[in-house]
């Protein structure tokens, strides 16, 4: 098998050299920052990467934004990149509970004898409760994110071609 290239291949060689010298850390950093921004926007819109609205609360004030009581989860979203990978995520232990939801999870009081919480207008105390928390995914890559990644890559490819 053989490949034959006719014509002036200097531009092709130059483009390939430009790719070889490309700053992949910068490319991945650009992608990671874009993904972090869209993740934070999902908190504002209260929706998943698939643009599905998060399930409302069964109890309490439905006018309050979900996953926004203190802002800790939202503020823990970080982006990181190196020459091989772009990542967006959080290190909070409870993030997976909100991302994937839980069924029949037992919660016990840690720092006191009883848990205290409000259901409607009534305060309730219990040693432990079983909770079901619906999934409210905030991490992921949406169709819009894919387009943004494509645009970032297109920019760097054009830059390599133009030299």
Please give the residue ranges for each predicted region:
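Short, Lys/Arg-rich flexible segments
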Residues: 1-163
